[in-house]
Amino acid sequence: MCTRQLTITNPHYKKLAEDFRVSIKCFSGREDFKLHVPCGHCDECLRKRQQQWFLRANHVMKRLKLRPEQCLFCTFSIKPEVYEQTKEKPYLAIRRFMDRLRKHPRFREKGPSGRYRYRKVRFPYIFVVEFADGKRARERGLESTHRMHFHAILFNCPLYWWQVRDLWESCVGRAWVDPLNSEAGVRYVLKYMTKDCKAHQYISDIDARKNGKLFVSHGFGRLSKEDIKIMRENMLRSSTSWFCVYINNFRYSIPRYWRTACFTKDEIKCRNDSLIPAVLWSIVQQKYRGLSPFQQQRIYYCLLWQ
């Protein structure tokens, strides 16, 4: 749970006030006029975001039936000539690299008219921005410049690892590319998303906003109609399956995107109202087993009506 929740005005009432040209204070008496939302930057929020993107990546690998060695684990650095330009707009370097990859001679073929063309190449990918923390520089007795670089996973990339390495090194900088050993490599790359916190803000404010920034391919982890049907059935099996999913015997909370894709708002509210009280009471009994039943009830009601 977020440790620094923000209180905001419900955007729904802002829109209603604009549409009917009335003061937003007219809706201040509504129960959901003020909403408590996660801050998105505390350790808990970043950890939750990392886990949710790992679930998407795991879903991509299952849907495409990929083995880890069919994915590429990459670290991309940037040469001085293009460093400032890349640091200002990291997504441009990624986009240009992907454009060059799609125009690789391997994808050049003759069309029906006899003219050469490039066949369409699409595959999922993840890029995470990181600014060096200076740890290795200190070990070598050097001063760190906290340079920006990318960590990436290319899922089912149609090129060999050395071709990807040569493409990046031909115009952007150094590259270290290897086949992925296991899904732990995906978690390793996504852990750099947690760099967006005070403990790692040793750089300027502008650069700090980019530290841990995530870039993914269009539609990454999107659910198909068949996926929605299967997930809907699985989530309705029990109270546990509604809140979490197991991957390699590890429990992960269900991403909000999956729940909203499979159910309507009314269905989600109805399901939560029926399950949360019982689940919360069992958690209170387990965590505060040394307290009296009366004290447990007080804690339970405080948490339930927060």
Map each language-model feature to its residues.
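Extracellular, beta-strand-rich glycan-interacting domains
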Residues: 154
